[in-house]
Amino acid sequence: MSELTALTIAEARDKLKAKAITATELTDAYLSAIDAANDAINAYVAVTHDQARSMAKASDERIAKGEAGALEGIPLGVKDLFATKGVHTQACSHILDGFKPEYESTVTANLWADGAVMLGKLNMDEFAMGSSNETSYYGPVKNPWRAKGSNADLVPGGSSGGSAAAVAAHLCAGATATDTGGSIRQPAAFTGTVGIKPTYGRVSRWGTVAFASSLDQAGPIARDVRDAAILMKSMASLDLKDTTSVDLPVPDYEAALGRSVKGMKIGIPREYRVDGMPGEIEELWQKGIQYLKDAGAEIVDISLPHTKYALPAYYIVAPAEASSNLARYDGVRYGLRVPGKDIADMYEQTRAAGFGKEVKRRIMIGTYVLSAGYYDAYYLRAQKVRTLIKKDFEDVFAKGVDAILTPATPSAAFSLADEVLANDPVKMYLNDIFTVTVNMAGLPGIAVPAGLNGQGLPLGLQLIGRPFEEETLFQAAHVIEQAAGRFTPAKWW
């Protein structure tokens, strides 16, 4: 069965089309793999055995009739942030206990319309708040990668840790994920997978539990660049139910792969050389520069002067929006309800019991920066900084730069239950140092594995593109992937 789960989406698609395998066989292979591995990795919070089998059966019938969709019979995992009709959707929070939506998110509806099969819901940081998948009510996810000669558990990154771990461990062919400040790109880098955060407005947010509405964007995590391009084509669409959705035709992203990058101008931002950055990250960055140079790209030094303000500004804007978005969870209509002596007490008790520590911390920060005395000093100033960050990118792109190459993360995956990070949230927030600018500016960004560190752990590079030019990112990422190769963890689970 493991040879079936080793197939990429592109390979499985071809075999299904040629009737060399059936969707039912493929789905059963993944369900068996999940049942065998999930206790160890904890990537799934709900496995939809019956639904997966009936969707696979329907796929086989459509293939037999010659009516196959673009993702016909491909088994996918869904981050627990996407509404799935009649299926567990709890954003990995206690406050949404037992919630099963009566509607489907636009992203998942698009995937099912193209014939994909749902294997289940994937673990994540609670309400997508975290960089290590340790804030989930359902416990942490373990990274399928381990350092050479070590049995120590590592984090898969966050918040889409379940998505990245499931893809890396071959527990799904691909997965949906979301990115508010790096939640697709950082876990992809930590697990040797590919993750793309599309331009804001490219993929509908409808039916996705909101964290920070002006920053959130859904995208895929996949095993390679081609698979990410295939998934992205199905996920992206115009959606009138999302007022930020953009009416632009969805290109065939897969067709961009293999196109030459000759003459493409790649910017290298000097501000991304941060103090204390490990030598192996700098080395990897240089390697990526060389890969693109060898393929004919032109490398130019650029400056993004407001980069240093991005992280503090992000950790004002995102919690502010979260404090507003999470005000709706009160125990009245759905989810957890803790009785109280009156309605105000019931709200208080429910929210105290329902939200985890990190979510409470961010709600409190958000409420504080939006309060009358501090709104101008914090929130308004952060929004001004955001405008300056966006302008930095616009200026660089106006000079003819096609894409920007940076590291994806400041380190490889770190230890699960790291005490220093547990006691110092700011140190944990620094994981997003290379990724938040992309969300603040609403740009597309892709993380692609580019090598292993001295301990044998994957490291990723990030490419940042012009708005709605994801094709350029796929094109350049494919060049790096071809040069660096693909990486799969040694099985310990």
From Swiss-Prot:
PROSITE patterns: AMIDASES. Its EC number is 6.3.5.7. The active site is at residues 79, 159, 183. One of its GO terms (biological process) is translation. Pfam families: Amidase. Heterotrimer of A, B and C subunits. This is Glutamyl-tRNA(Gln) amidotransferase subunit A. It comes from Brucella melitensis biotype 1 (strain ATCC 23456 / CCUG 17765 / NCTC 10094 / 16M).
